[in-house]
């Protein structure tokens, strides 16, 4: 289901075609934010299909949010944090684009699964407010217990984050 910032509210079917909104409540991942119909069909649909095709992510991810720069955030059901994937790969060829999006999602979510299993299970599900998976081989997490105000230096803000390196998908 798509609820875009521009007011559009619709569903995508299995063929990536737009369907009108209905009053039926469905158990789907909702996508919000800076989404036009082309982006929904070409990027959100393969992203959500990849998430829904995995039992863990089908149960854990409840929302996809697209930022103005087209970066993608995921909102999980468990844990009070946001997961940032980064910007999805862009290809003009539809088949290459779909394959690249699925590969992108699988690589990021494999890293997140390991982090959930070996990191958050030890540190606590609510330790971090933001988990950034944008960069390969590292996960950057913003700790919840530190707030940045306007007078705080960049060094103090960075000290409020944890960088976990060498996190690769197998």
Per-region residue spans from a language model:
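Charged, solvent-exposed interaction patches on well-folded alpha/beta domains
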Residues: 1-170
């Amino acid at each position: 289901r798509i609820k875009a910032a521009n007011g559009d509210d619709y569903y995508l079917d299995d063929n990536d075609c737009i369907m009108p909104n209905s009053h039926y409540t469905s158990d789907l991942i909702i996508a919000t934010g800076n989404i036009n119909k082309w982006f929904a069909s070409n990027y959100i649909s393969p992203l959500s299909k990849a998430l829904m095709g995995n039992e863990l992510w089908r149960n854990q991810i409840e929302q996809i949010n697209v930022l103005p720069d087209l970066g993608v955030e995921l909102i999980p059901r468990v844990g009070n944090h946001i997961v940032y994937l980064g910007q999805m790969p862009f290809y003009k060829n539809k088949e290459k684009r779909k394959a690249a999006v699925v590969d992108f999602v699988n690589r990021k979510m494999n890293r997140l699964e390991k982090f959930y299993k070996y990191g958050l299970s030890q540190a606590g599900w609510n330790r971090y407010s933001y988990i950034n998976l944008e960069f390969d081989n590292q996960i950057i997490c913003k700790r919840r217990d530190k707030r940045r105000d306007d007078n705080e230096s960049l060094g103090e803000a960075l000290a409020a984050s944890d960088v976990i390196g060498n996190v690769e998908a197998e």
